[in-house]
Amino acid sequence: EKQLPKVDYIISNLPFIREKEIKKLNPNIKEINKLIKEQTKAKKTLSKKSDIFAYIPFYLYDIISDNGKIGLILSNAWLGTDYGEIFLKLIQKYFNIDRVVVSGNGRWFNNAKVVTTLLIATKREISDPVNLDRRISFCTLKEKLENIADIKKLSSEIILNKESEQVNIQSYSISEIKQLENIGIPWSGYFANLNWLPAITEKLLDSKKIFKFIRGERRGCNRMFYPAA
């Protein structure tokens, strides 16, 4: 058995494996929840509905050197689901999210049914206080990857937070994100300019006070419910 040295960077396209397959392929992976509880004293841990990508960054934490970076291609499910909210709260105890990149023009991988995102983050000390002034960039690619001739130029624009014909960039501080979260805006909304929203918070009304929402139901025989005119 050989002790591997810690690395400064990890770049990975993690597999997209649904919750149902996780138990078969790696039944011990959910032991990570025990580790998270021990290290963070968190009351909530990763949901049973989580894809496998939600577990792996926490394993990477001990492999990465101090202030090391991860670049992970993930399903976009973490941006707007219940288990994604828990994942976000937990991963930010281990890493400072620097930027999130999505496609605004089609999927990146034709052989994948899921929509992908790129998350770039820096390792932090779990016990360190949160820096509310630190900013996170939310980047939207305007062109398909295969149509972008100079990927290095695009990468530089993203790193420098410089908008161009190829990428739109919105940047929010942790303090601003907390404000938006309190309003009820999920992370999937931060790729748009929402700087105006906190100013009208007092004028907003919870739609549940006006409408009653129910979950849609799937039926096997749609013709029964949609008769011909």
Which role fits each region the language model picked out?
Residues 2-227:
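Signature of N6-adenine DNA methyltransferases within the class I
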